[in-house]
Amino acid sequence: MTITLQQLIALSPLLIVGLTVVVVMLCIAWRRNHFVNATMTVIGLNIALLSLYFVGQAGPTDVTPLLRVDGLSMFYTGLVLLASLATSTFAYPWLQGYPDNRDEFYLLVLIAALGGILLSSANHLASLFIGIELLSLPLFGLVGYAFRQKRSLEASIKYMLLSAAASSFLLFGMALIYAESGDMSFASLGKSLSDHQIHEPLLLAGLGMMIVGLGFKLSLVPFQLWTPDVYQGAPAPVSTFLATAGKIAVFGAVMRLFLYAPMADSESVRIVLGVIAFASILFGNVMAVSQTNIKRLLGYSSIAHLGYLLVALIAVQSHQLALETVGVYLVGYLFSSLGAFGVVSLMSSPYRGPDADSLFSYRGLFWHKPILSAVMTVMMLSLAGIPMTLGFFGKFYVLAVGVNAELWWLTGAVVLGSAIGLYYYLRVMVSLYLTAPQQLQRDTPNNWALTAGGVVVLISSIAVLFFGLYPQPLISLVQLAQPML
């Protein structure tokens, strides 16, 4: 098989991140220098992000039977690269005080980003599985990076065992679908799995097992048990990656699968996904209400956010608006999560033991760091879906899709979930403006806004407010992110 120049250009983000992995490995082997390796990582991710412009100029193309590069894959690749860039930036000050090898952290983030990019372009069940594994395996190490802390090690082992079980379900489900259809590419699955075939027992069993595997990766109810513990145990920069790139890349691949294979049109699959979405929205929001740890709270909140996105996924075959909804919602979720976890990272760095993740640590933050508490307030308002923030447009789109698709009970769940969510987001905001306790020690540097992590947090908050007030540029961008059908 000969690879043309157009195919090479289409693969450029993947190739650039792969090359960065090799360069960082060689730098570690030659001489350990934390600053040099962090800089190499950030430069590599930025070049990969810039290369998306040239990928767009080259136009949509099938690189191999496994990968399809089009507007949709470019959009998700961009989001994964932004999340990886933010994770590396937040990790730098945290790693400054880390007593063991620091440089491998960036290596693991880059390999996970490679998996995310592969998932974004996946057009075949094989590339879907390889992408998921390439994304998950480095996360085992990243979650347990603070291994001297019992909670981090416990989170890593828990995530590893449950992830291995979920991957085996996913693989077995793919095997059953292949046994029934004789093909593994998304487009061929769409042709071979016609409506009368979808009720075959073997096929339903395969689909069920795939839903279990993918539900775990997206932390949907009832496969969400790992989420709060892993978010709490993982270092704050790793929780950032888990909440953003880890979810966005998998959701992008699932979107493509549902677009090409008409599984979502099957009534039985719609009902199962509807029940999962309903349970995720209510469970995530109700459980978050009683949390006093901000990382656990954001973990439960992410379960609810993926439940909202599932409403659009159910309607993706029949409603053009659903694709746009997912795009707008994910951008809002990305920037809000980067900002919220970024504040936790800034409060926690450098590595000295547990993160500053209890709500008590944020009590009276406004009187010490007014701009940082304003950023946190904006992020909470956006996650709650309050007008004039980007999160509001995401929720509005989800409700519009739910009404258009006549998913009344799910639309009701979104409204109820948002009302419950407002309560616990307000709890975080109120604690920021209470009287500060005397004995509370804060690690945040006075010049936090001039650090790289501070700049990322400020850019995220500006993006949330700008697109919340003037969403047209974002909507135009999302409309370009069309799949090649």
UniProtKB/Swiss-Prot annotation:
This is NADH-quinone oxidoreductase subunit N. It is found in: Cell inner membrane. Its EC number is 7.1.1.-. GO terms for biological process: ATP synthesis coupled electron transport. NDH-1 shuttles electrons from NADH, via FMN and iron-sulfur (Fe-S) centers, to quinones in the respiratory chain. The immediate electron acceptor for the enzyme in this species is believed to be ubiquinone. Couples the redox reaction to proton translocation (for every two electrons transferred, four hydrogen ions are translocated across the cytoplasmic membrane), and thus conserves the redox energy in a proton gradient. Belongs to the complex I subunit 2 family. One of its GO terms (molecular function) is NADH dehydrogenase (ubiquinone) activity. It catalyses: a quinone + NADH + 5 H(+)(in) = a quinol + NAD(+) + 4 H(+)(out). The gene is nuoN. GO terms for cellular component: plasma membrane. The lineage of its organism: Bacteria, Pseudomonadati, Pseudomonadota, Gammaproteobacteria, Enterobacterales. The chain crosses the membrane at residues 8-28, 35-55, 75-95, 105-125, 127-147, 159-179, 203-223, 235-255, 271-291, 297-317, 326-346, 374-394, 407-426, 449-469. It is an enzyme of class 7 (translocase). InterPro entries: NADH-Q_OxRdtase_suN/2 (IPR010096), ND/Mrp_TM (IPR001750). Its main location: membrane. It comes from the Bacteria. It is a multi-pass membrane protein. Keywords: Cell inner membrane, Cell membrane, Membrane, NAD, Quinone, Translocase, Transmembrane, Transmembrane helix, Transport, Ubiquinone.
